[in-house]
């Protein structure tokens, strides 16, 4: 399949010159890529992460019964638009992150843990980053909504905590990455612009699958 086969919603507050430039970028990029069904979700001006959490809650609630590709407004396209759509997956990450979430603290912890899923995808268990995700199943959307309604700091850390309870996969080659053009000085594109080759656990610790997670 191709990413253009899905409705896409991108989140952008568009409340000042900086974010208006991002909106223009997203409209231009998605138009050039051939997306036919593009929605701009104008997020609120609350402090992060409440604004992003509320935006995702509203989007996932509205599009509960259809697969929906949600993008953040700081992404660029890598040139890869084809992917494998496997039955039974709850979500597909079209954007990668090298970073893993800490299991209890609001910090990252080394490289993310993945395991083989197919020739083109891996299963993820604690990957940070929410810049390009295809949400597929209602049960996963409901779990994300419930998680984001609780007090949180970083939304991607909150999201990572429920990944082991679902079948969440990531494409080994991303379609989108978070670009230095739209982020603070010192941002390194390679944090989200890379290819997953041989899945292996991070050297810092051995990942233990939580046994008390269950969502329906």
Where are these regions (language model features)?
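An acidic/histidine-cluster motif and surrounding catalytic segment
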Residues: 1-71, 75-216
């Amino acid at each position: 399949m191709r990413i253009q086969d899905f409705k896409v919603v991108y989140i952008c507050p568009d409340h000042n010159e900086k974010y208006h430039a991002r909106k223009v970028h997203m409209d231009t990029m998605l138009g050039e890529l051939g997306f036919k069904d593009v929605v701009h979700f104008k997020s609120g001006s609350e402090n992060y992460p409440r604004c992003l959490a509320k935006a995702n809650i509203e989007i996932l609630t509205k599009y509960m019964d259809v697969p929906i590709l949600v993008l953040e407004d700081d992404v660029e396209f890598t040139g890869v638009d084809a992917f494998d759509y496997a039955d039974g997956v709850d979500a597909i990450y079209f954007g990668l992150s090298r970073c893993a979430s800490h299991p209890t603290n609001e910090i990252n912890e080394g490289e993310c843990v993945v395991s083989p899923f197919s020739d083109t995808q891996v299963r993820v268990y604690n990957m940070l980053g929410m810049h390009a995700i295809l949400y597929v199943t209602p049960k996963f959307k409901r779990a994300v909504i419930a998680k984001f309604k609780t007090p949180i700091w970083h939304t991607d850390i909150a999201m990572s905590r429920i990944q082991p309870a679902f079948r969440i996969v990531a494409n080994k080659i991303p379609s989108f990455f978070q670009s230095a053009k739209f982020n603070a000085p010192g941002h390194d594109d390679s944090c989200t612009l890379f290819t997953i080759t041989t899945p292996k656990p991070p050297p810092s610790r051995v990942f233990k699958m939580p046994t008390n997670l269950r969502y329906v």
